[in-house]
Amino acid sequence: MARVVPLDSASEAAATLSGVRAQLATVWLGAGGVLDLLLITVLAGGHVLLEDVPGVGKTTLAKGLARVLGVAFNRVQFTSDLLPADVLGGSVYHPGDGRFEFVAGPIFTDLLLADEINRAPTRSQSAFLQAMEEGQVTADGVSHPLSPLFTVIATQNPIDFDSTNPLPEAQLDRFLIATRLGYPDAAAERSLLGEYRSAPPLLPMLDPAGLLRLREQARGVFLHPDLAHYIVALARATRDDPRVRLGISPRGAIHLADAARARALLHGRSVVQAEDVRALLHPVWDHRLLPRQGREHDRRITAALLDELTAGVPLPR
């Protein structure tokens, strides 16, 4: 029988996460919902895709998240000449003693910013995303495990598609959440020009062991069978409509359940509620749904279609 998180433990976790969020808010002046989605991704042990234009704070946010969580951070700029070994690492031959040594690449970290992932060659994308999914890098028949905290924040520009290789549907499905940061409001943008630059340095609110405990707590949040049936019904509603080329996969349903558990813990609850599922429907599923008509990368089209497809699924009583 699965261990359920006690209510007092959930409240303590929420208090800790509130401190993390408050620290991040000193360097991120945009919508607060983005911070929640990043924390949900980390708690659920998933990966996030940020689809946004340059200059809106993606790198600052990723570095800040790693700092506040107390985990290691690396950044890789994906380019058209990037090789798999540039990210994963590989074996180096030492002629002096005739041996090979594995040299770890930047993927061997806790939090990795994969910047402009759609600019890399498809071979490099595939190798990276396979390692991301499997949690290990295999070289010369030897598997090298990644960090148990390994989390990817990948970015791609939704406007500039010249010389890019859009991620295939099967690879998009590996991201727990896809979202956009958006531009800050006028007041926040004015702050960027002034007092924001003198903000105090971020303080670590967690360490790797503490973050692992929070992930374990998130897995222990109770999902009622009725809500599990509801998630399955939502996913199945996307699969048999003539307007849909590709509906939500079983992995997408699992990801929604995992994210809902993480959101419940973020709000200090030991039980998932229907509002957790509904609040995460678009961040978890919009990038997985592929309509037959319209531009594949236009999330407005997929969001509207997802609303229509799931509107008739009754909430559990």
Predicted feature locations:
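C-terminal engagement/docking regions of AAA+ P-loop ATPases
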Residues: 2-7, 240-317
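Pre-Walker A (pre-P-loop) alpha-helix and adjacent loop at the N terminus of AAA/AAA+ ATPase modules
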Residues: 10-53
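Walker A/P-loop
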Residues: 39-79
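Walker B catalytic acidic pair
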Residues: 52, 115-116, 127
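P-loop (Walker A) phosphate-binding loop of NTP-binding proteins
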Residues: 53, 87, 155
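AAA+/P-loop NTPase substrate/partner-engagement loops
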Residues: 68-96
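Canonical AAA+ ATPase core
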Residues: 94-99, 116-124, 132-208, 212-221, ...
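Conserved AAA+ ATPase small/helical "lid" subdomain
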Residues: 203-256
